[in-house]
């Protein structure tokens, strides 16, 4: 049972990165009241030095100084996933070994912890599968009622997992954006906490622990390149936060380049990058088509401007992968003992054939193959 007496740490305020509007801590507001855009957190922590981490909890909560919430009670031991070499200079972080089998647990535990403090009547979320599963699991752990909105065509295995945790599943006709729109409408009801992995900045402050772990795994340094799959950009933006925190604290002397990977079938950000655009607003993007990488099939990500800026500021770039590259990468990883879902192999698909040159890199393997099965041959 959650220990509410431990929840006395003041919450930082949120603000809109577009117009600066501030949203006080402790409210159920999920977006900017003026522009309806996503929020950021007014929080600039200082990470602990490497040697001070010895003996701490073997989970992402070992980086307590960098997290906006303290005294976790909903934890399932998330974080501290293995880092294994795939080939010389390129390693993989096995985030598919999280409690719900995807990296989304990093952010979901922060959202559940926040919801406990705000004490809503209900929690709603939207997802193509993995975020919904993670939020359902952590809401179950926190004993919070939860409804997850998913688009039609979501993997049956992911739907089963969401339901198994006791969440109500609402399948919405249409694509990923249709599911998000339905969840946002529900989120406007009084007493509702919108556990959005896109709009709520607490999620990003959970995903940033991915890079804090890399830094610790690599003995206080980072690779030349951090390769990240991008749909809504939550892992990439979390990575950018962590890099900034480590650099500001003097714990790294150079920032790695962020390489953002999209499916060629749904690649609005890669198109904007190629056009030199700073946002998707007013930009004619190519039509989308079905993709095996359903988890990053986001035609209009709300944080597009932030994603493009983060990649540009890091000296990184965008890469796209074809459906055949995804199939081949999934089988290649399976032949090495790593069974990863089709979305989760996108980064390996992007770099396995030499896109990095001699630079060192880490790719995340974001979701377990059991969630989708092996992609069928073309």
How would you name each of these model-derived features?
Residues 4-378:
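PLP-dependent amino-acid enzyme catalytic core
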């Amino acid at each position: 049972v959650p220990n509410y007496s431990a929840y006395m740490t003041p919450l930082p305020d949120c603000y809109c990165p577009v117009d600066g509007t501030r949203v006080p801590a402790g409210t159920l507001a999920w977006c900017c009241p003026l522009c309806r855009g996503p929020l950021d957190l007014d929080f600039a922590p200082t990470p602990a030095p490497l040697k001070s981490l010895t003996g701490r909890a073997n989970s992402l909560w070992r980086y307590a100084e960098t997290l906006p919430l303290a005294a976790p009670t909903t934890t399932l031991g998330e974080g501290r996933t293995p880092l294994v070499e795939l080939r010389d200079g390129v390693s993989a972080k096995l985030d598919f070994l999280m409690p719900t089998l995807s990296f989304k647990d990093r952010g979901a535990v922060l959202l559940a912890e926040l919801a406990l403090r705000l004490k809503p009547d209900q929690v709603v979320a939207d997802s193509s599968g993995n975020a919904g599963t993670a939020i359902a699991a952590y809401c179950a752990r926190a004993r919070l009622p939860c409804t997850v909105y998913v688009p039609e065509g979501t993997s049956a295995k992911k739907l089963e997992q969401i339901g198994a945790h006791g969440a109500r599943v609402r399948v919405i006709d249409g694509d990923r954006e249709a599911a998000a729109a339905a969840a946002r409408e529900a989120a406007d009801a009084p007493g509702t906490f919108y556990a959005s992995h896109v709009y709520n900045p607490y999620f990003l402050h959970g995903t940033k622990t991915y890079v804090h772990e890399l830094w610790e795994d690599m003995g206080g340094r980072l690779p030349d390149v951090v390769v990240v799959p991008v749909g809504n950009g939550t892992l990439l933006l979390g990575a950018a936060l962590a890099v900034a925190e480590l650099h500001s604290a003097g714990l790294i002397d150079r920032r790695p380049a962020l390489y953002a990977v999209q499916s060629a079938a749904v690649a609005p950000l890669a198109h904007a990058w190629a056009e030199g655009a700073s946002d998707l607003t007013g930009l004619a993007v190519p039509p989308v088509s079905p993709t095996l990488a359903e988890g990053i099939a986001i035609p209009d990500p709300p944080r597009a401007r932030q994603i493009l800026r983060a990649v540009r500021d890091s000296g990184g770039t965008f890469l796209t992968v074809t459906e055949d590259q995804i199939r081949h990468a999934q089988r290649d990883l399976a032949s090495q003992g790593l069974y990863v879902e089709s979305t989760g192999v996108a980064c390996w698909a992007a770099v396995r054939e030499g896109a990095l040159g001699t630079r060192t890199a880490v790719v995340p393997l974001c979701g377990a193959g059991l969630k989708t099965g092996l992609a069928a041959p073309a």
